[in-house]
Amino acid sequence: MKQGVVVDMVVLGEPLVEFSADRALSEAGTFHLSFSGDALNASVTAAAQGARVALVTRVGADEFGARLIRFAAERGVDTRWMARDEGSTGAYAVGADPSGERAFAYFRHGSAASRMGPEDVDRSPVADARVVLLGGITAAISDSCAQAVRHAAKTASGRVVYDPNFRSRLTTPEAAAAVLRDVAPHAALVKISAPGDSGALLGLTEPHEIARACLDLGAGSVAVTLGEGGVLLAEGDATPVRVPAFPAAEVVDQTGAGDSFAGTLAAWLARGESLTAAVRAGTAAASISLGGRGGTGRVATRDQVEAVLG
């Protein structure tokens, strides 16, 4: 970390250009351009919660890369560690059929962000941030990125939050489970969704069993996210507690809801809030995010989250 650099939290991952359509991709003729990706969604949400957050990544030395940096900066994200790279900026297209079922097409193979490695961690504030948010998607996009995630978990002196965020298009259950096993002993919190992530990586779907398995891997605490069922929060040997979900006032698109949860949770931890308060804030932010289209279509502010919390 360079002298004089002060951040509350760091997010490591790949931002993406988003092309969204209001109909199936096979029929779409017009797309809306925006920016998303789990790392960007979480970073923008954390900034909206008042955290000083840095996004560590690489974007292409192209116009989309420049626009991504500008988009993040305009939303309060510290972009000094968004390096320009000769690889292309990753992108995806998303459309929906009449029933609302979404379909995605990704264009990220060999992207600038996939060229990240441990050296990107070493040039960043990871070692000094209060909270470092890491994800399984980042680890899945290349071997060097998986090395970067593992290195960041070991390098961080603050609290590591890890979201396995399993994607079968990017990796295998075995490879994703291996990253979880390596990162969990360094994680203050593992956030894992059930049954999606837990079934693939742990072979478990019962929330208490999932929490126990992650604690046994070495995680300090575990947040098992259950959609409308809320969150099961487990810390050490204490009795797990259920944190209820907040009903969404409007459901437009579920894209990025989990990222909103993770980014808000990490931001509240970085500002010194308790884990339970941070999880409640994350559930509130996720419910608000459902009202917007795309990963960054509706980003909850701290005032909005506090209004939901009451």
PLM features per residue range, with description:
Residues 44, 69-70, 181, 212, ...:
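Alpha-helical segments flanking ligand/cofactor-binding loops in enzyme cores
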Residues 1-78, 250-251:
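Glycine-rich phosphate/adenosyl-contacting loop at the front of the ribokinase-like
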Residues 2-10, 203-310:
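Conserved phosphate-binding/catalytic region of the ribokinase-like
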Residues 56, 82, 243-244:
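Hydrophobic residues at beta-strand termini and immediately following loops
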Residues 70-89, 97:
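A glycine-rich helix N-cap at a beta->alpha junction
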